[in-house]
Amino acid sequence: MVRIVYEEGLEAIAKRIAQASSGDIVKLENAMEAPGVLEEVDSIGLVYCKCGKDISDRMVRFIKEGLGSIELKGLEYLFSICVCEGSAKPQYALKVVNRLCSQIGCLPSYSKAVSSDDKTLEEICRDVSKESIRLADGSPFIGLYMKANKKRFKEA
């Protein structure tokens, strides 16, 4: 099951991605109050805003304290969607999420930016709904990294 954690104001985007992947959504604040809602899922998606060139303090706290406090052994994959408007460059925000996730023992297998452009969102929905994303599409060495560094991931 896919569960998508989204920041306030991004519910419509999170719902579209969840529908494409037959998953459901949880507001960031609710996931912070009860991080256990993420323990029984095999896939977690993070949908967050780019704030300046960084991500919000709420999302930083959620990754460190929320995701970091639960058992991720059942997690098959984690994906990260950065929402930015206009021609903003999201690379730094995506790197921040990757770094924070690696500190708690996991890495997103898929990271992408989306704007209000439907074409980009449709591409993300298509990618997330594919089974091939579970193989860390675009980042083929994530599994090796996690094993070599004894990171938390689903046991084979």
Question: Which positions does each model-derived feature cover?
Answer:
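FMN-binding flavodoxin-like domain, especially the glycine-rich phosphate-binding loop
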Residues: V2-A12, R16-E29, E33-A156
